Amino acid sequence: MSWNTVVGLEIHAQMATQSKMFCACRRQAGALPNSNICPVCVGWPGALPVLQGEAVRCAIRAAICLGCDIQELSRFDRKNYFYPDLPKGYQISQFYHPYALGGSIP
């Protein structure tokens, strides 16, 4: 049996938006701890995230620049983790239906 090497790349980028991805709290580097938070940020029961359009536009522009295929259907999912530095116990992810697929770095 022969094996082929397969290498994947997952890219995370911090976007230069005024607010966070799923709430209207300011995205401010260097701010005092817990000064730019809301019920959505800390995962309070009943607090629902609201996707910020500015962040989506930045993500789509980046995907176009990388030559990705922009998908017509997109969905967010919760990925549950039990890490001490993740008090909500989950991350919001696009594992199954991301905004973009493929692409390359020229």
Q: What is the role of each PLM region?
A:
Residues 1-106:
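Basic, nucleic-acid-interacting segments
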